[in-house]
């Protein structure tokens, strides 16, 4: 029997966090190539530090002239990302930061294992394990600690960028310790919020006065009480932020990107990777499947694991765990999953429409628990497979 009464903690980071700056640039590069060619191959990594951004990795287009043209756009893509995030500080400014582009063409040896040949479906871009998770504890079928940690930072970014709160800077982190009773979230025992601020004379109390109304706005009513412990900018001043304060790298916030530690993680990052890479596409598929299992009423919680081998199209294994919250045997759910969805790399991309420039928007505030969008963004958050799963079990 799983625990019913406990405290669980998750954190999030803002779009201005150094690692998220890098995720954003990597996904913006990916979107640029997918705009030109839906089958483009991209593995883009970004490093950011004081006054410098380095972009490297592998890319591939069928048209070599177009490939050279797009290579020339990388500098401006990175600057546009930094500008939109809001960095205009002396040692990290979108106009003056030095951009180094080390991207090159994808290895033919990798391509031969992934590309479809006559009579053979394309293989997975790498080996690996991917997890998906869903739970009834929030309307988005996400764990509450990570979902509301994201919501706090997203709201603070909105009021910073629209000019309502000009004292706030782009770099911020949140952390919520959520109280569970009978397995459901009911309150917050402690809250941590650290945000960069542009006025060096602001105190922690000043910052709390700015952010507290927005935090109360996004959290469910009654979750904050007199017993909730607040830590707002607990170290004091936070003026130097972003890549000038700490170096950033693509792919270092994989728990923030997923379930906040409430579910297993296979270890593969998402940003900068085109959807032939199962680190990304199969993790999206696993979330889609888990969410649809829960949306179908087959369980209150569901964890899905998929595994792949490089160059092999079909998953090596499908695993489901409903954590004792459903009446359907996990083995029956596994069989149903294999029946209702093609889990080859191409099958996933086709089913979820992943060969589109829909990735830059995923780079901050979580890849999961978002609303599906009209242009195909966050398609893995749809629940259109629920009825098929119910029939298949």
Swiss-Prot record:
Q: What class of enzyme is it?
A: transferase
The protein's predominant localisation is cytoplasm
GO CC, sorted alphabetically, is: cytoplasm
- CDD domains per UniProt: S-AdoMet_synt
* Recorded metabolic or biological pathway in which this protein acts: Amino-acid biosynthesis; S-adenosyl-L-methionine biosynthesis; S-adenosyl-L-methionine from L-methionine: step 1/1
Cofactor binding summary note: Binds 2 divalent ions per subunit. Binds 1 potassium ion per subunit.
**Role noted for this protein:** Catalyzes the formation of S-adenosylmethionine (AdoMet) from methionine and ATP. The overall synthetic reaction is composed of two sequential steps, AdoMet formation and the subsequent tripolyphosphate hydrolysis which occurs prior to release of AdoMet from the enzyme.
User: Quaternary form?
Assistant: Homotetramer; dimer of dimers.
PANTHER family annotated for this entry?
S-ADENOSYLMETHIONINE SYNTHETASE
Which named protein is this? S-adenosylmethionine synthase
What species was this sequence derived from?
Answer: Ruegeria pomeroyi (strain ATCC 700808 / DSM 15171 / DSS-3) (Silicibacter pomeroyi)
Q: Which gene encodes it?
A: metK
């Amino acid at each position: 029997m799983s625990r019913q009464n406990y405290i669980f903690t998750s954190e999030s980071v803002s779009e201005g966090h150094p690692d998220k700056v890098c995720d954003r640039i990597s996904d913006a590069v990916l979107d640029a190539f997918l705009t030109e060619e839906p089958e483009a191959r991209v593995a883009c990594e970004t490093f950011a530090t004081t006054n410098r951004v380095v972009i490297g990795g592998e890319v591939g287009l069928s048209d070599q002239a177009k490939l050279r043209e797009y290579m020339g756009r990388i500098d401006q893509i990175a600057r546009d990302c930094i500008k939109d995030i809001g960095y205009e500080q002396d040692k990290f400014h979108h106009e003056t930061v030095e951009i180094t582009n080390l991207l090159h063409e994808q290895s033919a040896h990798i391509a031969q294992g992934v590309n479809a040949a006559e009579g053979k479906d394309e293989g997975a871009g790498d080996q690996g394990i991917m997890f998906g998770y869903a739970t009834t504890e929030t309307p988005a079928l996400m764990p509450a600690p990570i979902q509301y940690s994201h919501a706090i930072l997203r709201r603070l970014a909105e009021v910073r960028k629209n000019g309502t709160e000009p004292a706030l800077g782009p770099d911020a982190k949140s952390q919520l310790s959520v109280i569970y009773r009978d397995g459901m979230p009911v309150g917050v025992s402690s809250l941590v919020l650290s945000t960069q601020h542009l006025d060096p004379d602001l105190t922690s109390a000043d910052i709390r006065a700015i952010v507290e109304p927005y935090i109360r706005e996004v959290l469910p009513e009654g979750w904050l009480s007199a017993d909730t412990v607040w830590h707002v900018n607990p170290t004091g001043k936070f003026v130097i932020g972003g890549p000038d304060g700490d170096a950033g790298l693509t792919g270092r916030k994989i728990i923030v990107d997923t379930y906040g530690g409430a579910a297993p993680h296979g270890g593969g990052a998402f940003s900068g990777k085109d959807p032939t890479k199962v680190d990304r596409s199969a993790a999206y598929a696993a979330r889609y499947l888990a969410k649809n299992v829960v949306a179908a009423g087959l369980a209150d919680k569901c964890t899905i694991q998929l595994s792949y081998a490089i160059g092999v199209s079909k998953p090596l294994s499908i695993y489901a765990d409903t954590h004792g919250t459903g009446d359907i045997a996990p083995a029956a759910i596994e069989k149903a999953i294999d029946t209702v969805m093609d889990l080859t790399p191409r099958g996933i991309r086709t089913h979820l429409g992943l060969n589109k420039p829909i990735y830059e928007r995923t780079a901050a505030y979580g890849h999961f628990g978002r609303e599906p969008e009209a242009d195909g963004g966050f398609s893995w958050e749809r629940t259109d497979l629920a009825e098929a799963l119910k029939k298949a079990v």
